[in-house]
Amino acid sequence: MMVRPTGGLALTGKSTDEQINDYLKRWGIHQEFTYPFGKTQLWSLISRPGNLNDCHPFCKENEAFDWDGSNHIDRLEYLNGMTYIRQFLNWNEGEGYDLIIGEENGPQSYVVWQITELNDNQSSLSITVYPYLLANFNKALSFLPFVLYIRPKLRTYLKSVLRGFAYHAEHNQPVPRNYWGKHSWFS
């Protein structure tokens, strides 16, 4: 039975842009990967409903709830059973998207996926995460825990996710789970 998730942007009286600006005040982690194929193929990989089933090495199941021109919402269950809802805020056809992700009705991280065309046969995908972890802490006090613990964990995670799209494109089969090693947060 498909149950429509609740949650999303908080009802704070702020506009979507104002809430996104609040997310952008957090510490961010950026990772990028270059692919040996063009922007069109990369977009088709990252924009399909349920795409993480084939491309995400820590995904147990990725189920789309809404996936049409204006609404994109899905559920990502990790190998360890943790379940997150992804609500896409801005969908820029052929270019990328941004979304919030987190447990249903829980704290949300803000994520930006951006495609860059390098030439006809090469493109790159960058993912930038503004995690909810430490978001309510003073930036000066949260700097060391962020740099020493959270950033390395998320970088390892993002590298595996980005490489998963290349694996799927090259082998035309789902990326094996934990292919580049287990992750203590998601495996």
Which residues fall in each region the model found?
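Hydrophobic pocket/interface hotspot
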Residues: 41-46, 52, 74, 88, ...
